[in-house]
């Protein structure tokens, strides 16, 4: 079953609705973004979520100690890193990590295997931006790619293309933000429809 992460959640009610609709993880942004929240807001979201829903904090080149403090304060389960963080940074953080890799070329994806993290998130490459750009990339870059850890697919996913994406890439999970928004705000019907579509394709692909 392909996992689903709803990223950029700013409201506890949206987080709970997404979790109850079947989201496996909720992403909370601490980096510079229109979706950024304060640690206090993030803590409220984390505390509202039901059991078995992963709480993922998104950071970009944040000092390690600051990430650790925020993670402990909010009750984060996983740290997702979108900057130039090194392998040592990931190893020494003390939390399960997801490392975001921009899909520049095949070489950078293959080199990402060296990161000591729990999963790799492959996102569109847009110069000057660290994810959340709403753009897709050429999924052919992932064809035959040998990764030694789970692959999470991101980059411009929405209800119209996620079925094709899952069927073609066969990722461990998918990550969506702008694809379930209306006028920059998370939309519960879109979230439900997105998760439903992923589950349908997952079932057809695996038969379970």
From Swiss-Prot:
Pathway: Amino-acid biosynthesis; L-tryptophan biosynthesis; L-tryptophan from chorismate: step 3/5. Keywords: Amino-acid biosynthesis, Aromatic amino acid biosynthesis, Isomerase, Tryptophan biosynthesis. SUPFAM superfamilies: Ribulose-phoshate binding barrel. Its EC number is 5.3.1.24. It is an enzyme of class 5 (isomerase). InterPro entries: Aldolase_TIM, PRAI_dom, RibuloseP-bd_barrel, TrpF_fam. GO terms for molecular function: phosphoribosylanthranilate isomerase activity. It catalyses: N-(5-phospho-beta-D-ribosyl)anthranilate = 1-(2-carboxyphenylamino)-1-deoxy-D-ribulose 5-phosphate. One of its GO terms (biological process) is L-tryptophan biosynthetic process. It comes from the Bacteria. Belongs to the TrpF family. PANTHER family: N-(5'-PHOSPHORIBOSYL)ANTHRANILATE ISOMERASE. This is N-(5'-phosphoribosyl)anthranilate isomerase. It comes from Desulforamulus reducens (strain ATCC BAA-1160 / DSM 100696 / MI-1) (Desulfotomaculum reducens). The gene is trpF.
